Structures are given as structure tokens and as C-alpha cells.
Regions:
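Conserved alpha-helical segments that form or flank metal/cofactor-binding pockets of metalloenzymes
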Residues: 60, 65-99
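Histidine/lysine/aspartate-rich catalytic loop segments that bind and position anionic ligands
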Residues: 90-115
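Short acidic alpha-helix initiation/capping motifs at coil-to-helix transition points
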Residues: 23, 42-48, 77-83, 128-137
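Short alpha-helical scaffolding segments that buttress acidic/His motifs in well-ordered protein cores
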Residues: 36, 46-50, 67-73, 103-107, ...
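Short amphipathic alpha-helical segments and their helix-coil junctions
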Residues: 44-58, 102-108, 135-144
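Acidic/histidine-rich alpha-helical segments that form the ligand environment
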Residues: 113-152
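Mobile cap/lid helix-loop segments that border enzyme active or cofactor-binding sites
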Residues: 1-62, 111, 120
Length: 152
């Protein structure tokens, strides 16, 4: 049982509208958002951030973003969040079953990663997780971005 259980319907006035706005049409709100909704001011603030992080305005491509999120959630054992991203975004990010498996329990040297960029993203996540630092090659991903948005 969760120490901080998510809200369950029926929701207080305003909560259902906020939760519906955070999900695609017709999709019930995920457990994470229902837990956030225990603090509506925080939920409202995170909604804007989430819309940016999951949008085309983000400095990472959809594929880059999902490689990073899937690897991070796997390394941190955030099974629920990993499952949400694999279910909602893996196909759109063109991640193969072998790549999803590698992000979960493999590494950047697995043969399913033919592109340097994918391997560097995985290495960057692993370095941050293991050492709280990023390697010079991973920092190099941001070299073409004068504002450093990719690295951020």
C-alpha cells in the first residue's frame, strides 16, 4: 500500500478538470498525476512543466527523450513510470523490443544501438546515475547547441 495514496474518483470540484487536462482525451489519469493532485497548486505548476517536457518544443527529439526517460526509470527502478513511458511513447519513438530490453537491463554496447547518439545518451544517463557526473563525449552532444539546451 502506498504511503501517500492517489486520489480516487469522485474528485473534488476542479480536480477532475485538472487531471483530464493532463491526459490525452479519453485516457484516465495515471496514478502519478492522481497522487500529485493531492496538492493542486503543485499539480498546476507541474502541468506546465510537463507540457513542455513532453512537447515538440523540448530541445531533445521524442526518441532522445524516451531513451533518456526509459533508461533513467529503469536504472532507478521506477517501474510504474517506466511502464507508462514504454506503453505511451516507445512505438512513437521507434524503439524496438530489443532496445526496450536493453534500456531495461542492458547497456550502450548492446548491438541494438547502431547510432552513436543513442549510445551517448545511455552512457550519459548511466554516468549520472553511477557517479553524478557526465562524460566529456556525452557533454559533446550539446556542442551544436550554443544555449546548452540539450545538456540541460
Amino acid at each position: 500500500m502506498s504511503r501517500l495514496p492517489p486520489l480516487e474518483p469522485p474528485y473534488e470540484p476542479g480536480v477532475e478538470d485538472r487531471l483530464s487536462a493532463m491526459m490525452p482525451p479519453g485516457v484516465p489519469p495515471i496514478l502519478l498525476f492522481r497522487t500529485f493532485a493531492r496538492n493542486m497548486p503543485m499539480t498546476a505548476a507541474m502541468d506546465g512543466w510537463g507540457r513542455y517536457e513532453l512537447s515538440k518544443r523540448l530541445s531533445l527529439t521524442l526518441r532522445d527523450r524516451e531513451v533518456v526517460i526509459d533508461r533513467t526509470t529503469a536504472r532507478c527502478r521506477c517501474e510504474y513510470e517506466w511502464g507508462v513511458h514504454v506503453a505511451f511513447f516507445a512505438e512513437r519513438a521507434s524503439l524496438t523490443d530489443a532496445q526496450i530490453s536493453s534500456l531495461t537491463c542492458g547497456d550502450a554496447t548492446d548491438p541494438c544501438w547502431p547510432h552513436d547518439r543513442d549510445r551517448l545518451l545511455i552512457e550519459a544517463v548511466d554516468a549520472l546515475h553511477d557517479t553524478a557526473d557526465v562524460s566529456d563525449p556525452a557533454v559533446g552532444l550539446a556542442a551544436g547547441d550554443p544555449a546548452g539546451g540539450v545538456l540541460l
